[in-house]
Amino acid sequence: MAESDDEYDRKRRDKFRGERDSYRPERRDDRRPMGGGAGNARDEWAERNPFRGSAAAGGGGGGGGVGGGGGARHRPDYSDYRGSGPRPRYGSPGREMPPAKRMRPDWGDGEMRANPRFGYDPYLVQAWNDHYQSLHSAYSHSGHAPSAREPPPSGISNSDTQTQPAMLTLKQFLDTQDENISDSEVMRKYTEYKTDFKRQQLNEFFVAHKDEEWFKNKYHPEDSVRRSDEQRGFLKRRTDVFLELLNNGTISNVKVDSSQADALVRVLDTCVIKLEGGTDEDLKILDEKPKDPAPVYERRSERSERSEATESVVVTKREPESPKHQTKSEKDDDDLPEVESPQRKNVRPVNSDDEDWDDDEEMPAAKSEQQSELAAEKPAKQLNDEESMQANIDKNQKKSKKRKRTSSDDESSSSSSSESDSDSDDEKLIEKYDVEEGLRADQKAEAEKDKEEEEERAATAAAKAKQLPPDSPTPDEDVDAAAVEEQKNEVVAIKTEVNDEESQKTEQPAAEEEKSEQPKDDPEASSKNGEENEEEKAEKSEADTATTKAAAAAADDDAMTETIDVDKLKDSLKPRALHRTSSIFLRNLAPSITKAEIETICTRFSGYLRVAIADPLVERRWYRRGWITFTRDVNIKEICWSLNNQRLRDCEMGAIVNRDLSRRVRPANGITAHKQIVRSDIKLCAKIAMNLDERFKLWSEVDNADNAELNPEELKEATNGSGSYGFNSKNPVLQNITDYLIEEASAEEEELLGLAGDSKDGEGEPIERDEPLIQVLDRLVLYLRVVHSVDYYNHCEYPYEDEMPNRCGIIHARGPAPMRVTSNDVQEYIKSYEGKLQQFLAKTVQLSDENIKELGAKNPEKEVEKFVQANTQELAKDKWLCPLSGKKFKGPEFIRKHIFNKHEEKVDEVRKEVQYFNNYLRDPKRPQLPEHPGSSKRTESESGRGSGGYRPPMYPPFSAMPYGFAPPMMGGGGRGGRNFPQARREMPVEHQRRLIGYHDLDAPVNSDMFD
């Protein structure tokens, strides 16, 4: 039996099979026999078809195989899955172009032509030519631009990568010029052509992207200023947080070392909490250890013996949040447990619902007491119809109380079963996908428990006040008063469980029942004391007034209780975990999508914080990536699912859940702890901090206020004649920094004792640590990380970090140090690391006006004049039209005056557009399409050094003939009679030997001689 597809590939690995078969007139598929036989020993190997019988595999010769002998089972070949049609003669079906083979005689006209001179390549000969380009010709396109199918070199494999069009080489440019043009004129025109080509590409790129938000934030006169102010506000906020941590000693107590990862993470989290507006109370969340997931205790009813017998049934409690979703059968038989599928187990902590567990245990006892009371009252009092109705009302009210007060009337029981079933299904779906319900249960449980305790105390106090009426009631009235108090307590509890609308609905039936109970007690009293009807009426009126006063007092107490509970809940809130967030990653955002559009979609979800959009990449066709940040307690998967079902500007955003950072402290090279490297790092960090502070003008306001009092000479002396660090900086981490940059060494002692450095280089020296230097360096590294989002030990910057889900996410720290280090390793490390940080060390200087003029900068006044001329149209003699307004004038000067007076905003837009374009040109790191590979990668001969500086030689440079053969015949008139010097062979100078001439002594004197 074949172990893999290698058995199928073995046939394709037959090197010369395709070569031999292509020479035969018939096709391979026609020659392949369908039945088993001895003739197909090469095409039908036995091991290729292990599931066929012996007849198919061995041609009926006997045995072998899996099938044994009878009823051979046919297993389709791999070629059967390709469908009908001839099989390509080269390679696998999924490959677009054939592999490089030698030329087929039936493809062309018998020539070894490199590629078609005009048009596209229908036979994909270009693939052959590109593969053997280094062996046959350095000019793959015979003087023409590369075809569209040419794969870009230098490792760029993405065919969707946009590039500039190929610029003409000097040879191609010469083909477009006159034959009699001089060399100097050719060079001048070619230089102009390159300049115009660059201007055109910059202008086209600007026009293509000027309406996109990311481009406006960089260069637009208004949007760029607004974005810069926003970023500067972020930096100032970060600076304030860093100074606060520096003053309270948090920064000084931590080392940027991988061994102190927990302390570093705590510092970063502290910064995030402060940036989010947290207080010192919120910082206590960092001291709490992460809680383990609470154990799940699934309570089973004592009566459900069948659930104990089988393990496939899980009994859970009914949720209190969905009272209207209960069906009629559930209301009639409430004490039965709810049976759910074993695939989904509702995770509930122990303290999530203590009150419900107690109520469930009291349910059987309460029902038995209720039944005994009813059985005792019926023969004694012989209840009439009204009394039976009252008993039913009391029974329903007690039953609803034992059901966690899900309802106070029969509205939910009157709903149709179909609606309740559909609602319950929706509720189950919500529970199924609510992955963080278990996490929120812990937080809600404690708050609800405290709230219920306070409400019970207030209700008890109100009940005691109601139990003392002005006149002592009869024993029967005493029982009724207890029932009234129980109902009032129930109303108070219902108010705390449901919202305001439901509470109003439940209070009205309760108040009506209280009023209906009071006259029901009067007939009993009148039947016992028929002679004292007037006294009973007086007592009834007094009882009514007392009841109304008690109800009003209870309402006031209830309102006060709710107000007090809200204040207490605010005071008793836990520290907020502001450093923990949930986020969604958007993989594809079209360049036309704005940040405001994403915010509009996300603000519909609760817990939305911010959105960050990265700069576009040319490799992704200028598509961008985005991160949407929410609070930690949201259901991030449900939000992600909702975003995936939406399209923005006909673009699928590709939303996925962004995971938390795995390792926030990552180790760097341990050699960085060496004293010499630490001193070099301090110098580099100080330069970077100085450059970034100057770029964003963080300390410029303080410096300007102090330097305003100094003379120019004093100011120059204060800054040491240049912007060097440490002398007049208001940055606290840069003050007195020069004291640590002066290197000390005992050179004289080593010279006297004869201690040479060669021995140290051979054996190496141990790592020398200087704690004061390391402390200064750590303060600088943390300043760069917290304020400027620069990770020094990773020599990179984390852009737009204030809008990202993690505002201080990752930091690199010094790793474990090696035992010994050589001087060469130290010097090499310092040199290489300084090169990696050049992007931060070099100051960003905008291009001057002279430089941008060469790139095609525009003049505002000239562009305004062009705008006026474009909107001045002559209709007839002394009749001119302004297209902006449609008005007609007698002369162009009137239109000019009209445009400047009535369309001033249009003129301002033209000036802003000019400034917009010039700002783009001033940026030395401006985004633009990469150069075409054919333009950027040229050989020396293409750049104009061979053939007199203009024309390259026309023979293959990489496959030159062996030494001793004459060079190609390119002398004489050259192309078109031009007198170019004779071409030299493209060989290295050391291999070019002088030609030796042999002179015959008998020959005439004036014969040809080489020397």
UniProtKB/Swiss-Prot annotation:
Residues 8-33, 41-50, 103-113, 284-309, 316-331, 375-384, 427-450, 512-543 have a biased composition (Basic and acidic residues). InterPro entries: SE/Ars2 (IPR039727), SERRATE/Ars2_C (IPR007042), SERRATE/Ars2_N (IPR021933). Keywords: Nucleus, Phosphoprotein, RNA-mediated gene silencing. The modification Phosphoserine is found at residues 92, 322, 352, 472. Residues 81-95, 544-554 have a biased composition (Low complexity). It is found in: Nucleus. Residues 56-71 have a biased composition (Gly residues). It comes from the Eukaryota. Residues 352-363 have a biased composition (Acidic residues). The modification Phosphotyrosine is found at residue 90. Residues 1-113, 138-162, 284-558, 919-953 are annotated as: Disordered. Belongs to the ARS2 family. PANTHER family: ARSENITE-RESISTANCE PROTEIN 2 (PTHR13165), SERRATE RNA EFFECTOR MOLECULE HOMOLOG (PTHR13165:SF0). Acts as a mediator between the cap-binding complex (CBC) and RNA-mediated gene silencing (RNAi). Involved in innate immunity via the short interfering RNAs (siRNAs) processing machinery by restricting the viral RNA production. Also involved microRNA (miRNA)-mediated silencing by contributing to the stability and delivery of primary miRNA transcripts to the primary miRNA processing complex containing drosha and pasha. This is Serrate RNA effector molecule homolog. The gene is Ars2.
